[in-house]
Amino acid sequence: NPIPQLSPDFGAPSRIEVNVSNTSTPVITYYDRRRQEGTMLFTDQGIEWKGEVKDHAFIIEESADRSMATMVISAPGVRERKPEFIGFSKSPDRGIDVQAGDKIEIRVARIDCKAADVPTFLSRFMAERKLHTVAETPRDLMPMSEVLARMVRNIDERYYVGDQWQYYCPENADWMSYGWIGGLMNTYPMLALGDATHLEKVCHTFDFGLGHGAGASGYFYDVVGKDGKVIFRDGAREIHDIALTRKNADILYWMVKQMMLLKRQGKGDKIAPEWEARVKQLADAFVATWKKEGTWGNYVNAETGSVAVFNTTGGAMAVGGLALAASYYNHPRYMEVARAAAKAYYDNFALVGFTSGGCGDILQNADSETAIALTTSMMTLYETTQDAKYLTQAAHL
């Protein structure tokens, strides 16, 4: 397999190894669901050796018959192979020469606790994690006003003006890459500035972005070129009709949010009926897929609306998008599906303890982006329904 994981194939070698320098918190945790008990093993960054700190490595390995799992905290960390962006390369790690009388000290703080479920265990971890690492103070390198000024400049510098269309580019290329912290999302802060110049640029971007790139189902393809034609890249090079679920979920949430912002700014007359119709078609596509499949998967077929690749939390942002769309379009069925999807996503998180599927370039690995997307969606549901359970679930995430 091209990513670090325990093997899904019974009997195959099954091992994960990672150096502490690649972790946000130096800890191995495990949860016994039957006993409702959890254990956390916190370590230092590594060992002190001849004036240097040598990273620990964390290793988890399953036996061939899967009857036992071994967890190792090694000193120093020497991985068998080094994980790359996708795949592995030869490990650069080296051991140390130990002489008679040398001492290696490994400090491990073990925390055992009762936990009724995975979210409870993770909440305990969040309470403990800073207690076992060296305290760090914030590094205030520049005032927030300067950060905002630089970000506005960065987005403005990517505004493309062509013979036919003009729009904000989310990447360093003259194409529209939808969603994924980019296309039809980077327009929100520009719209919030409130001036006429940025409003005009945002409107041009909506005209181009919403006027192109949609399949027959209402879902959008991942990328559209400056000629208005779909660009098939990544997995779509092999299977043309697929589109990343996460990108479409981002479009839905942020487009409804931006149309709401325009109305709050007293600029509702700037909202083109074509925008509203296209965004509603996208909301309808999410509803139709959910009714048919009971999930939005990792990828959808932009033409048929069927799930092309299953599993993951890739559609997390669509929960919030449908919740907003229910209010914007006065369409209760959107809220019905938003609630159903929120329950399915949260129940899966509560079972496995992570979310995944937001990043098209890391397969179905766990990621932080779906975690914050689902958190945002839960908060949106709380704000739109006042149901306190969504606030609690957002806190768990």
Whereabouts are the PLM-identified features?
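Carbohydrate-recognition beta-sandwich/jelly-roll modules
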Residues: 1-277, 281-284
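Solvent-exposed loop and edge beta-strand segments that line ligand/cofactor-binding
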Residues: 90-94, 165-183, 233-252, 298-317, ...
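Extended glycan-interaction surfaces of carbohydrate-active proteins
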Residues: 150-171, 246-250, 291-299, 336-358
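Alpha-helical solenoid scaffolds that mediate protein-protein interactions
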Residues: 193, 202-210, 216, 258, ...
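Extended ligand-binding clefts on enzyme/binding-domain cores
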Residues: 211, 218-219, 241-246, 254, ...
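Helix-capping and short linker residues that terminate individual alpha-solenoid repeat units
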Residues: 214-215, 263, 287, 291-292, ...
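Active-site lining segments of carbohydrate-active enzymes
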Residues: 233-239, 260-332, 395-397
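Active-site neighborhood of glycoside hydrolase catalytic domains
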Residues: 315-352, 367-397
